[in-house]
Amino acid sequence: MLDIKVIRENLDWSKKKLATRGIKPEELDKLVAIDKERREALTKSEQLKQKRNEVSDQIAQAKRNKEDASDAIKAMREVGKEIKDLDKEVEDLTQKQNYILLRLPNFPADSDPIGPDESYNEEVRKWHEPTKLDFEPKPHWEIGTELNILDWDTAAKVSGARFVYYKGAGALLERAVSNFFLDENTKDGYTEVIPPYLVNDASMQGTGQFPKFTEDVYTIVDNDDPDKPRDLTLIPTAEVPLVNYFRGKILDGEQLPINVTAFSPAFRSEAGSAGRDTRGLIRMHEFRKVEMVKIVDEESSWDELEKLTHNAEHLLQKLGLPYHVVALSTGDASFTSAKTYDLEVWMPAQDKYREISSCSNCTDFQARRSLIRYRDENGKLHLAHTLNGSGLAVGRTVAAILENYQNEDGTVNVPEALQPYMHGMKVITKEPKFGE
């Protein structure tokens, strides 16, 4: 959530910044007008409370002197009623103010490319040239189906579209990838966490998914009343429980940065994705991902973003997967992010790069919503800065391995870094079908 004081005192700057993220200037004018009305009502209420205290002292003194205080008591009752009305007005205006604030995205960094969509993203660097095969590459969904290690048809019957079964070497490969990621992340100084996969509404609001993106997730309903949702949602990313672990806490600034990593399922409705990536592992309702989260101080967050991005790049390099790093434009960056680098891995059959990780600096945006603070060496409290990045999306990594390491005979070589995690397996060959 943005700081209303920053918006109030830098209105033109705020309008210019948020215009690059699709926010109309009238929205900020409305917000500032509500804030002005709220502060005026609050000031008047506080003045009346001070007056009430003074009159209360006068009444007490009059009673001690056995003097008539009936007029003062009547006046104080009128003041009390006015205070009650003003406090209700402040409460209503605060709700209106927060309604707008909770739906405003983060301010973009000055270094972000300015533009309304992904076509304005800018390549920052590239690692290795795209894989060139001397035969026509197959897409990963064909490879997985022909090797009988991925089964979308049965998953569609059991669950629906955008679900998959991993089998045999496919299941082993997915597990190998996730374990490899966790091992590498912990070597890089991250503490492994196994978080809850269901979180409450306060947690979803804390990291910015609620209230704006309720249609993108799966919420648990009450069996007794299906129209009444419970206060539990399946996590769309482990970022939610990892960041919210620190919600409401005051941290020791000397202990920062705090680095945590988690492997978890992720559940997404993919609202608005009809017709996009209907085949394969790129866009699923349920998938696995390893997440990295950093809680840092305000001075170091930009350096920590570079470290986070390099941590994610290191994983792709160890797997020998060509990729490039892209700085997202103001119109393509996520709601909570001030700056995002996307890592996009090369997919030979699609003849293009596809996103496999987003590394973001959310500055104090999530910390203000979640009240995550730290105390500096002088005892002063500050809002922390939060960063998050995929390290990496497991299913998309499996897809990239199948496409980049495929052989002409349909088999797939196992990247050297993963062979110890796959019981020494070097080549994935066709699996027998169950009961056939």
Curated annotation (Swiss-Prot):
Basic and acidic residues bias (residue ranges): 43-55
Localisation per UniProt entry: Cytoplasm
Keyword Transit peptide attached: no
GO molecular function, one term: ATP binding
EC code: 6.1.1.11
GO CC annotation, single: cytoplasm
Recorded metabolic or biological pathway in which this protein acts: Aminoacyl-tRNA biosynthesis; selenocysteinyl-tRNA(Sec) biosynthesis; L-seryl-tRNA(Sec) from L-serine and tRNA(Sec): step 1/1
Record's keyword annotation contains rRNA-binding: no
GO biological process, one term: selenocysteine biosynthetic process
Keyword terms: Aminoacyl-tRNA synthetase, ATP-binding, Cytoplasm, Ligase, Nucleotide-binding, Protein biosynthesis
Sites where the protein binds ATP: 268-270, 355-358
Sites where the protein binds L-serine: 237-239, 291, 390
Residue segments, region Disordered: 43-68
Family matches, as InterPro entries: aa-tRNA-synt_IIb, aa-tRNA-synth_II, aa-tRNA-synth_II/BPL/LPL, Ser-tRNA-ligase_type_1, Ser-tRNA-synth_1_N, SerRS_1_N_sf, SerRS_core, tRNA-bd_arm
Top-level division of the source organism's lineage: Bacteria
Subunit structure as annotated in this protein's UniProt entry: Homodimer. The tRNA molecule binds across the dimer.
Family: Belongs to the class-II aminoacyl-tRNA synthetase family. Type-1 seryl-tRNA synthetase subfamily.
Function description: Catalyzes the attachment of serine to tRNA(Ser). Is also able to aminoacylate tRNA(Sec) with serine, to form the misacylated tRNA L-seryl-tRNA(Sec), which will be further converted into selenocysteinyl-tRNA(Sec).
Domain comment, as recorded: Consists of two distinct domains, a catalytic core and a N-terminal extension that is involved in tRNA binding.
Official protein name in the record: Serine--tRNA ligase
Organism listed in the record: Lactobacillus johnsonii (strain CNCM I-12250 / La1 / NCC 533)
Lineage of the species this protein comes from: Bacteria, Bacillati, Bacillota, Bacilli, Lactobacillales
Designated gene of the protein: serS
